[in-house]
Swiss-Prot record:
Record-listed E.C. numbers: 2.1.3.15
Entries under SUPFAM superfamilies matching the protein: ClpP/crotonase (SSF52096)
Catalytic activity: N(6)-carboxybiotinyl-L-lysyl-[protein] + acetyl-CoA = N(6)-biotinyl-L-lysyl-[protein] + malonyl-CoA
Pathway where this protein functions: Lipid metabolism; malonyl-CoA biosynthesis; malonyl-CoA from acetyl-CoA: step 1/1
Function statement: Component of the acetyl coenzyme A carboxylase (ACC) complex. First, biotin carboxylase catalyzes the carboxylation of biotin on its carrier protein (BCCP) and then the CO(2) group is transferred by the carboxyltransferase to acetyl-CoA to form malonyl-CoA.
GO terms for MF: acetyl-CoA carboxylase activity; ATP binding; carboxyl- or carbamoyltransferase activity
Protein name: Acetyl-coenzyme A carboxylase carboxyl transferase subunit alpha
Entry superkingdom: Bacteria
Entry GO terms, CC: acetyl-CoA carboxylase complex
Keyword Cytoplasm part of the UniProt annotation: yes
Species, as recorded: Rhodopirellula baltica (strain DSM 10527 / NCIMB 13988 / SH1)
Record-linked Pfam families: ACCA
Length: 319
């Protein structure tokens, strides 16, 4: 599933090309098989070396990889009996926001998540994962439905940010994101949020208030994109790598700062290389968290959720 390589993966791509070339050889010999084994070992070693030392800008590139698993991929691989629900009961159906009933092991759940699309046609229809106000209203309607039927809510976050167009602003983009966060803070059912790729600004926060907030190892969660930050501070997108380093939005920083509760380890070389393995890890994590949350009294759950987000950004200075 890896697909086109990233710029910093050139050596890995060369090894994979050599392996593929030898495997296509119809006249296989022990010498060729031995060479394939050696190249595979070299590939694994290079993947470990590369992915154990990604810089923040490289992490952004991995998070944006076109073959990275999206919300619908997790629905297909980790969940059963998904029934999609459409519309916001107000304006329309935003394809950048998926929602519906599903089963995860023994749990009946409501799944909500950003969707980017694979082909250009799909991406355009999904606005490249940038939801409009109707997308967030759609999410809120489905969350209230989940609360009514006492279903846990699982949110998959993967967006560069909320859609920035004039129509979205006219229909109350900022207000609806604030309303969604407010509603989620008091939703009387367990909520688990996972950043699976890009966690961009208010677009991510709009479905990001939960009892558990996790991030994939090579995802990022930020107040602004590196390009946006570079454009504001240095008037040029060329400084995006510098901005990425300054924003401290990678999984290790997020965990250390208390922005997320857990980091989900990705398969070697990133989630885009093995959708099935990543989906299995996701399923295990979600099932474990749901088992813990179902035992918690609702009042205590809401109190802990509220305190979790009240503490974000608080720091003490020594005089």
């Amino acid at each position: 599933m890896a697909g086109p390589g990233l710029e910093f993966e050139n050596e890995i791509a060369d090894l994979e090309e050599q392996i593929a070339s030898l495997e296509r050889n119809t006249d296989r010999s022990e010498e060729i098989d031995s060479a394939i084994r050696s190249l595979r070992l070299a590939r694994v070693a290079k993947l470990k070396e590369t992915y154990s030392s990604l810089d923040p800008w490289q992490t952004v590139q991995v998070a944006r990889h076109k073959n990275r698993p999206y919300t619908r991929d997790y629905l297909n691989l980790a969940f059963d009996e998904f029934v999609e629900l459409h519309g916001d009961k107000h304006f329309g159906d935003d394809r950048a926001m998926l929602s519906g009933f599903a089963k995860l092991d023994r749990f009946k759940v409501m799944v909500i998540g950003h969707q980017k699309g694979r082909t250009y046609k799909e991406r355009a229809a999904c606005h490249f994962g940038c939801a409009h106000p109707e997308g967030y209203r759609k999410a809120m309607v489905k969350m209230k439905m989940a609360e009514k039927y006492r279903l846990p809510v699982i949110c998959f976050i993967d967006t560069p940010g909320a859609y920035p167009g004039i129509g979205a602003e006219e229909r109350g983009q900022a207000q609806v994101i604030a309303e969604s966060m407010f509603m989620m803070s008091d939703l009387k059912t367990p909520v688990i949020c996972v950043v699976i790729g890009e966690g961009g600004s208010g677009g991510a926060l709009g479905i990001g208030v939960g009892d558990r907030v996790a991030v994939l190892q090579h995802a990022y969660y930020s107040v602004i994109s590196p390009e946006g930050c570079a454009g504001i501070l240095w008037k040029s997108h060329e400084h995006a790598p510098k901005a990425a380093a300054a924003l401290r939005f990678t999984s290790d920083h997020l965990l250390r700062l208390g922005v997320v509760d857990d980091v989900l380890e990705e398969p070697l070389g990133g989630a885009h290389r093995d959708h099935h393995q990543m989906a299995t890890r996701m399923k295990t994590y979600l099932s474990r968290q749901l088992s813990e949350l179902e035992e918690m009294p609702v009042d205590l759950m809401l109190e802990q959720r509220y305190e979790k987000f009240r503490k974000l950004g608080v720091f003490l200075e020594e005089s």
